[in-house]
Amino acid sequence: MENIIRKPYLDKIEQALGKDVIIVLVGQRRIGKSYLLRQLKDEKAKDSSNNIIFVDKEKKEFDDIRNYRDLNAFIDEHRVEGKKNYILVDEIQDIMEFERTVRSYREEPDTEIVITGS
């Protein structure tokens, strides 16, 4: 099966990056939010000056991230000083009090936040 690059949507996300905003992709289930987030992750990973922090709450490897404290610990463990840190969280609504994390890391320099939710 061939993957479809959703360039117009990626371009819109790119335009919003660097503008001190939190990018939120919302919509009904199964419309491609997760796929778009993975495309963004793959695109940003091509640049070695970027650090990607990716959480996919639909994957069992992230089951231990249940609340904002768990998410903070995961992010802190994976952040890299001196690089542009991209915090990408898929299905963020599954993390209790996630808003606290989002507000906190929004203030961090060299940090971009893109999240999805249904």
Model segments located where?
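Phosphate-binding site recognition
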Residues: M1-S118
